[in-house]
Regions:
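Alpha-helical recognition/docking segments in bacterial nutrient-uptake
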Residues: 3-4, 61-166, 170, 224-229
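Short beta-strand segments enriched in small/hydrophobic residues
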Residues: 18-21, 55-71, 175-182
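Hydrophobic alpha-helical segments within soluble ligand-binding/sensing domains
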Residues: 153-178, 217-224, 242, 279-297
Length: 312
């Protein structure tokens, strides 16, 4: 016999409305109650009646996608693959921006609950706490940042920097400057910065690290500081910062080899000495949808996948 919300409520000794709120990720439900009800739902493999979806006017599943910035070259590559995979499954995307603001994520979550979306793909960032993220546990995948017991797709930041540094070192460079991101950013900033410094230390070459915000303008403004020391090559934490470096070098009639994480077709057209690394952005998008569909299919998972990197 097919289980109903009433059956779940009886087994948990709560009201039907409480079960409904858990299914809709209502933040007003206490953590203890949510976990108790979710445990019964997972154990019994309960799935809500799909007729409820039709009553709300949605013939197809809806997935909310929260990117940090729609103008991000990196995230747009991941988003493009996410959309391709969702369209293939007849799933409707609802795309919003967080702009690195936890408050906006909370507002978007409220919107998703109002729209009764089926699942969420969230591009994480350092300021976003686990407390906020776990509101959608059970129908959520994070991208770029991993959280405990939450399905996630994350990047191999440390190995990416180490791979590029190794290649530049093999080419004979010993004064490799690094245009990085503020350490408060755990992935693009902290992890990549630490990897650069560790390589310099292990290979006994001088470190020249300058931090910028993750924008072209900020990177450009930090370039004079980076160039105060001898530089034979410049490694950048992102393709946008590589554009900053290229702009500065061209304006000052300097020609130095550049390297960066990620691929930017326009940048590659103008930077002849560019070494890039395929960070696996499309693969991340494909895997994110896979993990979300697993959950929407009624299965519980906390799988976290690290995307491999490859020199272009």
């Amino acid at each position: 016999m097919k289980l109903t919300i009433k059956d779940i409520a009886a087994r948990c000794n709560v009201g039907k409305s409480t079960v409904s709120r858990v299914l809709n990720n209502d933040p007003k439900v206490s953590v203890q109650t949510r976990e108790r009800v979710q445990a019964v739902i997972d154990k019994l493999g309960f799935q809500p009646n799909q007729s409820a979806r039709a009553m709300r006017g949605a013939s197809s599943p809806v997935v909310g996608i929260i990117v940090t910035r729609l103008n991000s070259t990196a995230e747009s590559q991941t988003l493009s693959m996410i959309l391709q995979q969702l369209y293939a499954q007849n799933i409707i995307p609802l795309i919003v921006e967080s702009q690195f603001q936890p408050e906006l994520v909370i507002r978007h979550f409220a919107l998703f609950r109002q729209r009764r979306v089926d699942g969420v793909i969230l591009f994480g960032f350092s300021q976003l706490s686990l407390e906020i993220v776990q509101q959608w546990r059970g129908s959520l995948v994070t991208v770029a940042r991993a959280y405990p017991n939450i399905p996630a797709i994350y990047y191999d930041d440390e190995n990416a920097i180490r791979t590029l540094m190794t290649k530049l070192y093999q080419q004979g460079h010993r004064n490799i400057a690094y245009l990085g991101v503020n350490d408060q950013d755990e992935t693009t900033g902290h992890d990549r910065n630490r990897s650069y410094l560790a390589f310099c230390n292990s290979h006994q070459i001088p470190a020249n690290l300058v931090e910028a915000e993750l924008t072209i303008e900020s990177g450009y403004l930090q370039m004079p500081k980076l160039m105060r020391k001898p530089v034979s090559a410049i490694l950048c934490a992102s393709s946008s910062l590589a554009i900053s470096a290229l702009k500065y070098l061209q304006e000052n009639q300097q020609n130095l080899p550049l390297a960066c994480i990620g691929q930017n077709v326009l940048l590659q057209c103008f930077a002849t000495n560019l070494l890039t690394l395929d960070f696996g952005y499309p693969q991340a998008g494909k895997w994110a949808v896979e993990l979300l569909l697993t959950q929407l299919g009624g299965k519980t998972t906390t799988e976290q996948r690290k995307v491999p990197v490859n020199l272009s």
